[in-house]
From Swiss-Prot:
This is Probable pectinesterase/pectinesterase inhibitor 54. GO terms for cellular component: extracellular region. It comes from Arabidopsis thaliana. Disulfide bonds join C339-C359. SUPFAM superfamilies: Pectin lyase-like, Plant invertase/pectin methylesterase inhibitor.
Amino acid sequence: MGVIDMVLFWVLLVNALLIVDASSRNMPFAYQNEMQRHCSSTKYTSLCVQNLREFRHGSLDGLDFVSFLVNKTISDSNLLIPPLSSSMGSSKLVSLEDSTYTLPSPSVSDSCERLMKMSTRRLRQAMEALNGSSRKRHTKHDVQTWLSAAMTFQQACKDSILDSGGSSSASAISHISQKMDHLSRLVSNSLTLVDTIMKNPKPKTKSTALPRWVTAGERRLLVGRARAHVVVAKDGSGDYRTVMEAVTAAHGNGKDLTVIVGDDSATGGTSVPDTATMTVTGDGFIARDIGIKNIAGPRGHQAIALSITSDQSVLYRCSISGYQDTLYAAALRQFYRECDIYGTIDFIFGNAAAVFQSCNIFLRRPHGVKAYNVILANGRTDQRQNTGFALHSCRIRTDSDLSPVKHKYSSYLGRPWRKYSRAIVMESYIDDAIAEGGWAGWLDSGDEVLKTLYFGEFKNYGPKARISKRVTWEGFHSIGFEEANYFSVVKRRNGEDVTNGFKYKFKIKIQI
């Protein structure tokens, strides 16, 4: 760099600092005070202050601060990944500085672009909910859910690039990862402000049979009884003499008869998300009495049966069957009632706010001598995300292939996929196939994660439900009634379950 260039550089730097200092001095004291107060509670305080210094509306409303931060995240997301031209020979991911890095393959680029569009969609939902009259139509839980999902999709984009490994340059991977981390920090700060500023709605005293967002037609679909099409009578007066004859003749009317089947797996070179037999993205998805299988088998490694990124989704009396990574409960609010879920390693994974109520959880025989089973692998990356998994009134048991040899393999309730992983098991039956410690660590994640995770149990029963034998991690909790109620779908009165048949509320602080 020449002398003139050096002098010019320092002149520009000093001017920039003077402008920043002047902008701070020109801010009203009340605004500066509010900005500092709110930002002091965030994880990335300096970034929060830096962003809010750009806010020129002079509002002291904390929600306007949040709205500005969310809008900033949207703007930076759009700068990071513009629409990719399908005619390009190689896909490009554009940085915030407009320099380009070639991604390893079009499939990785397409996946990342899709995830970032999903992230931006949820950011826009949160933005709309924070603006003016919309604030009355949406709750704090809604905004937390959409911001949490936006961060989850950003992390998934980063993961897809990191998993591409040696096919991309180290500099490209590092550069793009840093940009994703920048976006996640912006969302983290927004989540913190939402958590500290917004108020929860007052609980309604009237109990509702189904979530408030389920329509009248959907209620009838879920709780209604089907009209009889055939009659079974031993004396021959009906359509069939035995139940088995009627079942055999049926063309599909239940989770074992109407089944969607796939066999993609990671061993065939397919990316893990793309192995899914069925992928659901539309909000308000409802499934009843249907089966979804991935039959790649235990040698197929990761092979998803069902992947869901649908907000306010409900699955009732469904069967979800696979081995490793069976159910990808990726993001947003999900509820599973009376479902059968089969698998081996991390077979319920993702970062949704998902509750599994009165479900059968079947452990299968894993492949390999040193193989083991893990049910829950939650991917919560920020302590302000309102995500996590809860098993409530479930039965954890072995499938027929594992039962004869279940003591040859270790099986666990869950393990921490991410730093702030959260999982609860309550009022559930725990088979003796589960290890006494109950929970497992994540490979080489270290001791720090054992402090930041949140695993809890409440009033479980069965041969391996003894809390006294559980892991002694700082992040493991034997929770009481109040904490259990916090994670329950159905709230109780005076310790009594107020459920009546298929009735539930879709509102917990993992916030369903």
